[in-house]
């Protein structure tokens, strides 16, 4: 067969394999195409071009052809083309793109062959010469391979393409979100603080683009991976200095990103204690209290509040933070955004029992919780009712509560009873919350507040409790507590 015959054959095969119904008919030609490509000439010819076209079309949405391609060592054949600095590299990447487009199994094989590194390098070198379809194709290759990446340097390399992505209308967030979902990449970043800082700066220093805020907020996801908390990132002086510089800046996006990072790092008790010794707490509080336009900068304020709330999760630190929770309530209550009301209610809930006197002395703070407990926002209403239940629990379990707390409790007994019933009405998919309400209801009845029992029997909650008692999806201890409550209710 002459060279022209070979060109004609593979051109014909490439054209016909555009038809999904015919692709399987040409499977035997995959080995021949790879054989022609195996000897990579310094200047590929039209024969090579048609072989690439045939492989790309025949492996599109055809698992049997893809299997043949990989079994015949197709990636090893194409890899030298991917590393060449010419237009044929784009055709080789097109074949790879079609082979892995909807196949997770083959993506892992391709990732092991360092194709992601080659794709990014080729994009960097050819970004001013490629046409739009090839940009889209390379972006999909990166997006599909980042979940299998093990080295943060490949993310750093990819971020250097942000100007090209923005210029070509490609959404970088979709691509890099896959990388930050990858625990190996995130641990790699945590072990390389300098590269992490440089990567953040690549995004920060970009002129504004549509997803800039979202892109910056990908970096705190690093600390969402539990494995990262076992690294020394939280103790790295360079990284902590960098976060501090973000708080000192006037850049709202940087402050938000730094707050989210701190919040995710302090999920572990010992890290929270270490970072409490730094000045980050005062930075977070100052950022919130000095904010003149809460609603105009709601993302920044929320991020700071969320970080503070994470500091409060360890029981050992709650007494320290209780005054802060009360201090912030008025500021956050001024917002029209219910997510800020929610986080305020949550911080107050975690501050029990250290603020019972404060709530009794300043009933306007308490009645703000009452208002929130009736909010149409389900999450806000539920969290506020949980906070009211927290007041009851700590009042009834703390020995010798002060008289003013006792008087305050009795004056608002109807509200507390209402909260018990409201929370007990919650769907069983919130077992922890239901458990809290069951426990508080038992406490109230045992302390002589029998009206709770009457309220429960007179409401649909009574039937719900009986269904919880025998629900196989609920924990044994919760069902036992429900049974105890029903006994108390039915014998009043």
From Swiss-Prot:
GO CC terms in record: cytosol; mitotic spindle pole body; nucleus
Signal sequence extent: none
Protein name per Swiss-Prot or TrEMBL: GTPase-GDP dissociation stimulator arz1
PANTHER family, alphabetized: RAP1 GTPASE-GDP DISSOCIATION STIMULATOR 1
Primary role: Probably acts as a GEF (guanine nucleotide exchange factor) for the Rho family of small GTP-binding proteins (G proteins) that stimulates the dissociation of GDP to enable subsequent binding of GTP. May also chaperone the processing and/or trafficking of small GTPases independently of GEF activity. May be involved in the control of polarized cell growth via CDC42-mediated signaling. May also be involved in the control of cell-wall organization via RHO1-mediated signaling.
Chief site of localization: cytoplasm
Gene name of the encoded protein: arz1
Any one GO biological process: establishment of cell polarity
